[in-house]
Amino acid sequence: MEWNTLVLGLLVLSVVASSNNTSTASTPRPSSSTHASTTVKATTVATTSTTTATSTSSTTSAKPGSTTHDPNVMRPHAHNDFYNAHCTSHMYELSLSSFAAWWTMLNALILMGAFCIVLRHCCFQNFTATTTKGY
Protein backbone atom coordinates (compact mmCIF):
# COMPACT_ATOMS: atom_id res chain seq x y z
CA MET A 1 0.00 0.00 0.00
CA GLU A 2 2.81 2.41 0.81
CA TRP A 3 4.56 1.67 -2.50
CA ASN A 4 1.42 2.74 -4.41
CA THR A 5 1.17 5.88 -2.28
CA LEU A 6 4.78 6.80 -3.05
CA VAL A 7 4.28 6.27 -6.80
CA LEU A 8 1.07 8.30 -6.73
CA GLY A 9 2.78 11.13 -4.84
CA LEU A 10 5.69 11.22 -7.31
CA LEU A 11 3.26 11.20 -10.23
CA VAL A 12 1.33 14.15 -8.78
CA LEU A 13 4.54 16.09 -8.16
CA SER A 14 5.82 15.46 -11.69
CA VAL A 15 2.51 16.62 -13.18
CA VAL A 16 2.60 19.75 -11.02
CA ALA A 17 6.20 20.51 -12.01
CA SER A 18 5.52 20.08 -15.73
CA SER A 19 2.26 22.05 -15.77
CA ASN A 20 3.71 25.47 -14.88
CA ASN A 21 3.21 26.96 -18.36
CA THR A 22 2.80 30.54 -19.46
CA SER A 23 0.46 31.30 -22.32
CA THR A 24 0.19 34.59 -24.17
CA ALA A 25 -2.97 35.86 -25.80
CA SER A 26 -3.12 38.97 -27.97
CA THR A 27 -6.14 41.16 -27.64
CA PRO A 28 -7.07 43.43 -30.57
CA ARG A 29 -7.60 47.10 -29.82
CA PRO A 30 -9.68 49.64 -31.77
CA SER A 31 -6.70 51.79 -32.74
CA SER A 32 -4.83 50.68 -35.84
CA SER A 33 -1.31 51.59 -34.74
CA THR A 34 -1.12 50.11 -31.24
CA HIS A 35 -1.01 46.45 -30.34
CA ALA A 36 -1.33 45.11 -26.82
CA SER A 37 -0.82 41.68 -25.39
CA THR A 38 -2.06 40.17 -22.18
CA THR A 39 -0.06 37.48 -20.43
CA VAL A 40 -1.98 34.86 -18.50
CA LYS A 41 -0.01 32.58 -16.20
CA ALA A 42 -1.53 29.28 -15.20
CA THR A 43 -0.58 28.19 -11.70
CA THR A 44 -1.12 24.80 -10.20
CA VAL A 45 -1.17 24.09 -6.49
CA ALA A 46 -0.76 20.55 -5.16
CA THR A 47 -1.48 19.49 -1.62
CA THR A 48 -0.34 16.11 -0.36
CA SER A 49 -1.08 14.85 3.13
CA THR A 50 0.12 11.42 4.23
CA THR A 51 -0.84 9.41 7.29
CA THR A 52 0.27 5.95 8.25
CA ALA A 53 -2.77 4.23 6.80
CA THR A 54 -4.04 6.42 3.95
CA SER A 55 -2.80 9.12 1.61
CA THR A 56 -4.85 11.94 0.13
CA SER A 57 -3.74 13.91 -2.92
CA SER A 58 -5.62 16.73 -4.55
CA THR A 59 -4.68 19.05 -7.39
CA THR A 60 -6.32 22.42 -7.85
CA SER A 61 -5.84 24.24 -11.14
CA ALA A 62 -6.62 27.93 -11.60
CA LYS A 63 -6.94 28.42 -15.35
CA PRO A 64 -9.00 31.28 -16.81
CA GLY A 65 -10.52 29.16 -19.57
CA SER A 66 -9.23 26.24 -21.54
CA THR A 67 -9.76 26.40 -25.29
CA THR A 68 -8.08 24.22 -27.84
CA HIS A 69 -7.83 26.84 -30.59
CA ASP A 70 -6.54 30.39 -30.71
CA PRO A 71 -9.50 32.79 -31.08
CA ASN A 72 -7.17 35.64 -32.12
CA VAL A 73 -6.34 34.30 -35.57
CA MET A 74 -5.46 37.70 -37.05
CA ARG A 75 -1.77 38.34 -36.63
CA PRO A 76 -0.02 41.58 -37.54
CA HIS A 77 1.70 41.35 -40.91
CA ALA A 78 5.03 42.82 -41.95
CA HIS A 79 3.24 45.24 -44.29
CA ASN A 80 0.25 46.04 -42.12
CA ASP A 81 -1.84 47.96 -44.64
CA PHE A 82 -4.47 46.10 -46.68
CA TYR A 83 -4.88 43.08 -44.42
CA ASN A 84 -5.30 45.23 -41.34
CA ALA A 85 -8.70 44.83 -39.72
CA HIS A 86 -9.20 48.60 -39.62
CA CYS A 87 -8.28 49.19 -43.26
CA THR A 88 -10.92 50.86 -45.41
CA SER A 89 -11.26 50.77 -49.17
CA HIS A 90 -9.86 54.25 -49.79
CA MET A 91 -6.56 53.21 -48.18
CA TYR A 92 -5.86 50.58 -50.84
CA GLU A 93 -3.73 51.74 -53.75
CA LEU A 94 -4.49 50.20 -57.14
CA SER A 95 -1.54 48.91 -59.13
CA LEU A 96 -0.97 46.68 -62.15
CA SER A 97 2.17 45.08 -60.76
CA SER A 98 0.54 41.85 -59.58
CA PHE A 99 -0.82 38.82 -61.38
CA ALA A 100 -4.14 39.18 -59.55
CA ALA A 101 -4.68 42.66 -61.02
CA TRP A 102 -4.04 41.43 -64.58
CA TRP A 103 -6.21 38.34 -64.03
CA THR A 104 -9.08 40.50 -62.74
CA MET A 105 -8.80 42.85 -65.72
CA LEU A 106 -8.77 39.89 -68.15
CA ASN A 107 -11.89 38.43 -66.52
CA ALA A 108 -13.65 41.81 -66.68
CA LEU A 109 -12.81 42.17 -70.39
CA ILE A 110 -14.06 38.65 -71.14
CA LEU A 111 -17.32 39.35 -69.31
CA MET A 112 -17.83 42.67 -71.11
CA GLY A 113 -17.12 41.03 -74.47
CA ALA A 114 -19.56 38.21 -73.78
CA PHE A 115 -22.21 40.72 -72.70
CA CYS A 116 -21.72 42.72 -75.92
CA ILE A 117 -21.99 39.56 -78.03
CA VAL A 118 -25.21 38.51 -76.29
CA LEU A 119 -26.70 42.00 -76.63
CA ARG A 120 -25.77 42.22 -80.29
CA HIS A 121 -27.29 38.80 -80.96
CA CYS A 122 -30.54 39.68 -79.16
CA CYS A 123 -30.81 43.11 -80.73
CA PHE A 124 -29.93 41.80 -84.18
CA GLN A 125 -32.56 39.06 -83.92
CA ASN A 126 -35.13 41.63 -82.84
CA PHE A 127 -34.07 44.04 -85.61
CA THR A 128 -34.25 41.42 -88.36
CA ALA A 129 -37.55 40.10 -87.07
CA THR A 130 -39.19 43.53 -87.13
CA THR A 131 -37.74 44.68 -90.48
CA THR A 132 -38.53 41.49 -92.39
CA LYS A 133 -42.02 41.14 -90.96
CA GLY A 134 -43.72 42.71 -93.97
CA TYR A 135 -41.83 40.72 -96.61
Curated annotation (Swiss-Prot):
Signal peptide coordinates: 1-19
Bilayer topology: Single-pass type I membrane protein
Disordered: region residues: 21-73
GO CC annotation: host cell Golgi apparatus; host cell membrane; plasma membrane; viral envelope; virion membrane
Post-translational modification: O-glycosylated.
Family note: Belongs to the herpesviridae glycoprotein N family.
Record's protein name: Envelope glycoprotein N
Organism: Human cytomegalovirus (strain Merlin) (HHV-5)
Underlying gene: gN
